[in-house]
C-alpha cells in the first residue's frame, strides 16, 4: 500500500557504457554487460524499444528478474512474442505494443530501464524507476547510465521495532495517508484466525523486503506448515528468492498470536540478512540479493532474539531449549546474552542471566539494557560487565507467550512498561504503569500510568519529536470495557503530560488488532479497526478500515509505503 506523495527526483549521470556494447556482441553478451554496469540484482526490468525481443529475453538472467518489453511496432512485438514463447519464458518475460510518451507504470516501480526509444523523456523514466533504480539509455553517442537517488526523507525498517533501541518509529516522512495499492503478493489469506498467525516477521533494507510466512494451505490448520523466508523487491514485489524455514513454532498455537519473540529473529542490514532458519537453529547470515548462506555463527544455537548495532550482533540465546509451557506462558529459564562480530563471528563476550524476559532487550551506543522479569539491568556494550540493576518493576505474572514488555532507549533514558498484574483475566492486557530510568545509573526518574496497548500483544511506548507517546486503544466500549482512544504525549524528562486528545472521528471501534502500534515522525499508526493515521500535531484521526496487518507482526512503515 502506497502513501501517495510526490518525490523530487534528480538523475545522476554516470559513466558511459560506450563501445562495449558494439554491434559485434551477441544479445547475451550485451545483456550481461548491461546488468553488470547497472548493478541491479533482481526486480523488474523494462526494455523500451524491444524490437525482435532477443535482447529483451537475454535480460532475464535469473528467476529473480521480471522483464517487460515495449515497442511501437506491431510486427516487432509479434516477432518478440514468438521468440520468447519459443524459449518457454513467456510470463517471466512479456512484451506489449506501446507508442505513448508516458510509461504504463506507477511511480517507483521499475528497477532497470534499458531505453532504445528516443521519444521517452528522461523525466518519465525517472518517475517510474525505484529509488536507486538505473536507466541505461542509448543514443547516437553511445550508452549513458543514470541513477535515481533514494530520497533522504525515506527510511528503512531493519528490526522488528525499527532499530536496536526498541523505538518503533520510522523516520520516513513520505509515508502518508493510504490512497492506492503499490503491489500485492500472495498468499491471499493466512491459515486460521484462531490459531498461529501465518506472519512471523518482516523487515526491509536496501530496497528489499524480507518476511517469514507459513505458505501451507488454509484448507485445514492441521496440515503441516510450510514456513519460508521470502525476499521481494520492496517497491514492486518481485520475488527475489525463498529459503525454507523449520521446524518452526507449532501452527496449532491457540488464538493466533504466537510467541512474541518470533518477529525478533529477523534483521536486515544493507546486503545481509540475519535470521534463525528453525526454532532451535543457530544464527545465520544470508546474502540479501541471492539468499545464499554467507555464515553460520558457531555457538549460537537457540538464538531467540537478534539486534545489530555498528557491526556487532547482540543475541539472546536460550541454550536450555525449554522456553515455554505448552502454548501458554514463558518459563523462567536461564538466558545468555551474547555479543559477536557480525563479519567474523568472533564472540566478544557472553553473560548468562537467570532470565531475560522475551522482547525485553535494547541496545544503544554504550550499553545493553534488558528486563530480567523483576528488574531492568544494564551491561557494558563492549565488555558485557554489569553496570547497574534497577528497583523492582511490575509485570504480568505469569507471562503469556503472546506478550512482551516494551523497553525503549532514548536520550540516556530507559522507558519501560511490563504490564502490571491484574486480577481479571479479560483485562490482563492492561498496561497500568510506565517507568523512566536513567540509562547511566538505573535511577528512577518518574513513573506514570500506562494505558492498555494492542490486544493480546506487546506494550506500546513510542518516542517522537522528544515526546513519549502512549494511547488508550486496547479495547472498545462494545467489548465490555470503555477505552476512550485518548492519546498522551509526555515530557521524557519529567513524565508530565504535554499533549492530550481523544479521537475526533465517530466510527465503529473494534478491539485493537493483535499487534502493537508503530509510528513515523508524523503519525501514530494504530489498528483499532484497520490502520488509523493519528496526526498528533493536528490532533486528528484518519481511518483506513480497508486494510490491517496480520496478528502477531502487524504493519511496517518504510520506503514511503506501509506493508501489511
PLM-predicted stretches and their roles:
Residues 40-58, 64-68:
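Conserved class I S-adenosyl-L-methionine
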Residues 101-112:
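A short acidic, Gly/Pro-enriched loop at the edge of an enzyme's catalytic core
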Residues 120-134:
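A short glycine-rich, Lys/Arg-flanked "PGG" loop and its adjoining helix->strand segment in the class I
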Residues 194-229, 254-283, 297, 301-338, ...:
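Repeat-blade elements of multi-bladed beta-propeller folds
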Residues 38, 94-95, 148, 152-201, ...:
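Aromatic (tryptophan-biased) beta-strands that constitute blades/sheets of beta-rich domains
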Residues 80-81:
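Conserved SAM-binding loop
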Residues 88-100:
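Conserved SAM-binding strand-loop segment of SAM-dependent methyltransferases
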Residues 25-44, 54:
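Conserved alpha-helix/loop element of class I SAM-dependent methyltransferases that forms part
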Amino acid at each position: 500500500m502506497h502513501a501517495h506523495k510526490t518525490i523530487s527526483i534528480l538523475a545522476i549521470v554516470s559513466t558511459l557504457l560506450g563501445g562495449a556494447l558494439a554491434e559485434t556482441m551477441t544479445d547475451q553478451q550485451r545483456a550481461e554487460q548491461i546488468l553488470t554496469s547497472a548493478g541491479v540484482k533482481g526486480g523488474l526490468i523494462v526494455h523500451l524499444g524491444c524490437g525482435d525481443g532477443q535482447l529483451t529475453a537475454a535480460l532475464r538472467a535469473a528467476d529473480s528478474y521480471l522483464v517487460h518489453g515495449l515497442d511501437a511496432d506491431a510486427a516487432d512485438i509479434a516477432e518478440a512474442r514468438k521468440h520468447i514463447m519459443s524459449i518457454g519464458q513467456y510470463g517471466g518475460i512479456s512484451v506489449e505494443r506501446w507508442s505513448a510518451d508516458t510509461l504504463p507504470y506507477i511511480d517507483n516501480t521499475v528497477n532497470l530501464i534499458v531505453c532504445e526509444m528516443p521519444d521517452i523523456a528522461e523525466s518519465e523514466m525517472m518517475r517510474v524507476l525505484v529509488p536507486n533504480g538505473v536507466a541505461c539509455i542509448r543514443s547516437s553517442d553511445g550508452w549513458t547510465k543514470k541513477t535515481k537517488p533514494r530520497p533522504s526523507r525515506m527510511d528503512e525498517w531493519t528490526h522488528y521495532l525499527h532499530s536496536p533501541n526498541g523505538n518503533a518509529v520510522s523516520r520516513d516522512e513520505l509515508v502518508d495517508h493510504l490512497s492506492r495499492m503499490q503491489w500485492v503478493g500472495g498468499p491471499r489469506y493466512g491459515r486460521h484466525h484462531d490459531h498461529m498467525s501465518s506472519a512471523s516477521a518482516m523487515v526491509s533494507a536496501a530496497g528489499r523486503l524480507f518476511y517469514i510466512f507459513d505458505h501451507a494451505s488454509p484448507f485445514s490448520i492441521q496440515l503441516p506448515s510450510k514456513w519460508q523466508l521470502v525476499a521481494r523487491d520492496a517497491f514492486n514485489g518481485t520475488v527475489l528468492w525463498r529459503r525454507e524455514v523449520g521446524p518452526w513454532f507449532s501452527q496449532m498455537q491457540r488464538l493466533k498470536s504466537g510467541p512474541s519473540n518470533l518477529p525478533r529473529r529477523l534483521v536486515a542490514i544493507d546486503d545481509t540478512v540475519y535470521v534463525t532458519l528453525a526454532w532451535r537453529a543457530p544464527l545465520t547470515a544470508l546474502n540479501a540479493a541471492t539468499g545464499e548462506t554467507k555464515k553460520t555463527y558457531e555457538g549460537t544455537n537457540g538464538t531467540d532474539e537478534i539486534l545489530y548495532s555498528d557491526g556487532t550482533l547482540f543475541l539472546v540465546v536460550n541454550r536450555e531449549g525449554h522456553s515455554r509451557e505448552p502454548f501458554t506462558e514463558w518459563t523462567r529459564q536461564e538466558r545468555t546474552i551474547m555479543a559477536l562480530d557480525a563479519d567474523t563471528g568472533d564472540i566478544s563476550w557472553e553473560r548468562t542471566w537467570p532470565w531475560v524476559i522475551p522482547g525485553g532487550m535494547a541496545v544503544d551506543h554504550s550499553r545493553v539494557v534488558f528486563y530480567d522479569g523483576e528488574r531492568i539491568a544494564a551491561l557494558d556494550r563492549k565488555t558485557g560487565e554489569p553496570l547497574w540493576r534497577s528497583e523492582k518493576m511490575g509485570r504480568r505474572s505469569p507471562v503469556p507467550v503472546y506478550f512482551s514488555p516494551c523497553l525503549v532507549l532514548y536520550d540516556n533514558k530507559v522507558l519501560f512498561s511490563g504490564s502490571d498484574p491484574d486480577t481479571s483475566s479479560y483485562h490482563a492486557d492492561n498496561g497500568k504503569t510506565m517507568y523512566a530510568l536513567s540509562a547511566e545509573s538505573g535511577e528512577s526518574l518518574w513513573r506514570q500510568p500506562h494505558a492498555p496497548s494492542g490486544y493480546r500483544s506487546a506494550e506500546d511506548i513510542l518516542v517522537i519529536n522528544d515526546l513519549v507517546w502512549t494511547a488508550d486503544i486496547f479495547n472498545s466500549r462494545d467489548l465490555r470495557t470503555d477505552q476512550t482512544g485518548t492519546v498522551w504525549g509526555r515530557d521524557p524528562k519529567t513524565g508530565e503530560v504535554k499533549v492530550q486528545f481523544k479521537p475526533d472521528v465517530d466510527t465503529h471501534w473494534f478491539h485493537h488488532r493483535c499487534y502493537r502500534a508503530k509510528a513515523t515522525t508524523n503519525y501514530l499508526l494504530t489498528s483499532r479497526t484497520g490502520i488509523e493515521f493519528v496526526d498528533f500535531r493536528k490532533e486528528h484521526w484518519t481511518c483506513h478500515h480497508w486494510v490491517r496487518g496480520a496478528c502477531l507482526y502487524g504493519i511496517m512503515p518504510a520506503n514511503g509505503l506501509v506493508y501489511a
